Amino acid sequence: EVIALIGPNGTGKSTIGRILAGLLKEKSGEVVLFGKHCRPKDRLGKVWYIPQDLDSQLFGEDLLDELTTGVEVSPERKKAAEEILEALELMSFVKQHPSTLSGGQKQRLALGVALMHEAPIIILDEPTSGLDGTNMRNVSRMISKLAKMGRTIIVITHDAECALACCERAIRLENGCITDDFQIRGAELLLDKIGYDKKEG
């Protein structure tokens, strides 16, 4: 399933994403994953958080190195990394330094890293921010592809177009609280829910 966590800036979307990933500790309440209460350290690796600022997360010398950083490298794992790059349409850039990729390609590479670590839940924070139309469509297509591979994807966004492009369900936040939780069946429903002006947009 691909879920959009939507709402204006400052409503706590990124904070919730970081809490789910175990990067921040909740001040109250509890996080339940797979039917069990999970402490922050228990969520690490199960929930993979991809931040908006990807450059601060790129450490590899090339794309293959980026995917295998932090995992035990074996011939099987190297082959798995190559297959992921192929699936994400990045194999032709395998020898390039990650910093030389476009914004959309970096997003796809970050998805590949999450796949290498076998995280069942992937959170993307504003994955299409700053991307042109072509790259936005490419990233959205890859997100949908990953969902079909059995991953749960949470897309944090304030962009209705991004949510419509790849998400099946939307959860709307306002002032840190959930105000709506609904299936996306078409543009009219989502745009009406978030108060998006269709004539202007």
Label every model-predicted segment.
Residues 76-93:
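Conserved ABC ATPase "signature" region
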Residues 29-43:
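Conserved ABC transporter NBD signature motif
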Residues 6-8:
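The feature captures the beta-strand-to-loop junction immediately N-terminal to the Walker
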Residues 21:
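Helix-to-loop junction immediately C-terminal to a conserved catalytic motif
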Residues 97-101:
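Conserved ABC ATPase signature
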Residues 122-125:
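Catalytic Walker B motif of ABC-type/P-loop ATPase nucleotide-binding domains
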Residues 157-158:
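H-loop/switch region of ABC-family ATPase nucleotide-binding domains
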